[in-house]
């Protein structure tokens, strides 16, 4: 089992951010966490990575039961994370190669000399992800898509059991977005691939390699289940409080409004 949350709630600064979350992810499942801005997605990710602890309820992630075992770095080394928050913490003068290498130590920057095996692994990942050509370039000079590939290589360095991709294609143009989504499909289809949790508020990013979706709305689970059972006209119209029509193309969902927007 990858994770299990039973009746989990989170209170921060006197406000309930998450309420009564029930969620179970089995090994080899790939999930989408889908919700609008402010739905509580970031807070939920912070709990999964043990930066926050639940106010109430029971929670297990990768065999670690919150409140009963020591977490922190021990858990986070099993999780590969790609997020905008992480990107802002990295040293801009580091090369893409150094960024990837740092994933072996779950560190920001390098503070020890990597072994030959570690260096070869980083090179192999950068090659596999189509990023080797800019391995020696400073991180700050890379395009957003190139930065994301370096971050994904970093996330995979420690052979994580869970790979969390938090809105990884934000800021990319159409071509760069589709190329990175192709890379994510490639990763998901590899032998011994980690379970993937893909976080987004754009339905068109949801790929056929994802099995299930958790719909989060105002800190609560709106729905959870198979992708095509969750992303229906009826469910999404209720989720968005507006009529929605779902178009499927090559097993990917695209949303349109079922009625035109009118002025109030």
From Swiss-Prot:
UniProt domain ABC transporter: residue ranges: 3-243
UniProt-listed Pfam families: ABC_tran
Triggers of expression: Highly repressed by CodY.
Annotated InterPro entries: AAA+_ATPase, ABC_transporter-like_ATP-bd, ABC_transporter-like_CS, P-loop_NTPase
Cellular component GO terms, alphabetical: ATP-binding cassette (ABC) transporter complex
E.C. designation(s): 7.-.-.-
Binding site for ATP: 35-42
Coiled-coil ranges from the UniProt annotation: none
Keywords assigned: ATP-binding, Nucleotide-binding, Translocase, Transport
SMART domains assigned to the protein according to its UniProt record, in alphabetical order: AAA (SM00382)
One GO MF term: ATP hydrolysis activity
EC supergroup of this enzyme: translocase
Family, as annotated: Belongs to the ABC transporter superfamily.
Name of the featured protein: Uncharacterized ABC transporter ATP-binding protein YlmA
Organism: Bacillus subtilis (strain 168)
